[in-house]
């Protein structure tokens, strides 16, 4: 392990001792705000320190076993060789675990997301593929135990969607889906193609973390134009009776959001406002990330939605993620929701990139 990382762990050990003392201090205990803050920090630091103590113990065991390698007794040397090999293996595993614990935490990882899928070049075929992608992500969400709620949809003339917006709720949704933003390209023979020619179409996907508290994003009511209209979505006969659908325009940014899936105008407005907050937050984050990217560009995770990130080739049964040069010949499984086949290698590559930078 790098000396710089060991130094960080030593500093963290000192902080752990300090937190232990603070949490036993009567003055801190009487101040619930400080007590909760220190308790949260303690809970985050403790697993790292316990692992670091194990690391130091195994390190001492290794040094002791190595000293015995010089012993005159051959049986003792053989035993020491076994202990050295075992200790080195445990030390390497603990070192890897500690490095991952020290990786910078993305504060958005635990959040729900707004998933936006839009048809790009390719006309009807692009809209159909948008529908396929939405189905793929919905199946993946089912596997993860997440809940998918459609907020807005604009259906294509021959199936699929020109645009579909959904909220995905569950554990660590953003952590899994954050690298799906970008341009997704499909190569296949459309059902309407009589000559059997392969067509290329594209869709864009955007994954926006839902802010924890809408209040964190300052939205001036004077900056909003709110329009209501009769829903053309779900709701049966009710949709013909009231203007329950809501469209909100944020005038300074030009961002427009709408929700028509609920029968209640109040619920549609609340969901549209949450989505607007996410889009404004995303706009702020994008500006900050651009500044970081100019200094150091990560292999995975630039989040540029104009970037072509993946190709789905149906004739070959192939899916290729261009960011990490990953090619799989299990397109059918992926389209049925096994997106983890692509997501997990992306996450591993991102972690490897972070690990390489750790301690710099």
Swiss-Prot record:
Q: Which HAMAP family match?
A: Rel_fac_1
List, alphabetically, the InterPro entries matched.
Answer: PCRF, Pep_chain_release_fac_I, Pep_chain_release_fac_I_sf, Prokaryotic/Mito_RF, RF-1
Looking up Gene3D superfamilies in the UniProt record yields:
3.30.160.20, 3.30.70.1660, 6.10.140.1950
Tell me the keywords, alphabetical order.
Answer: Cytoplasm, Methylation, Protein biosynthesis
Lineage from the top down?
A: Bacteria, Pseudomonadati, Pseudomonadota, Gammaproteobacteria, Pseudomonadales
Provide a Gene Ontology MF annotation, just one.
Answer: translation release factor activity, codon specific
Q: Name one GO cellular component term.
A: cytoplasm
Tell me which stretches of the chain form a coiled coil: none
Compartment list: Cytoplasm
Q: Which residues are annotated as modified residue N5-methylglutamine in the UniProt record?
A: 237
Report the sequence similarity comment from the record: Belongs to the prokaryotic/mitochondrial release factor family.
Q: Where is the signal peptide?
A: none
Protein's UniProt name: Peptide chain release factor 1
Q: Which NCBIfam families match?
A: prfA, PRK00591.1
Q: Name one Pfam family in it.
A: RF-1
Regarding how it is modified after translation, the entry says: Methylated by PrmC. Methylation increases the termination efficiency of RF1.
Q: What does this protein do?
A: Peptide chain release factor 1 directs the termination of translation in response to the peptide chain termination codons UAG and UAA.
- Origin species, per record, is Pseudomonas aeruginosa (strain LESB58)
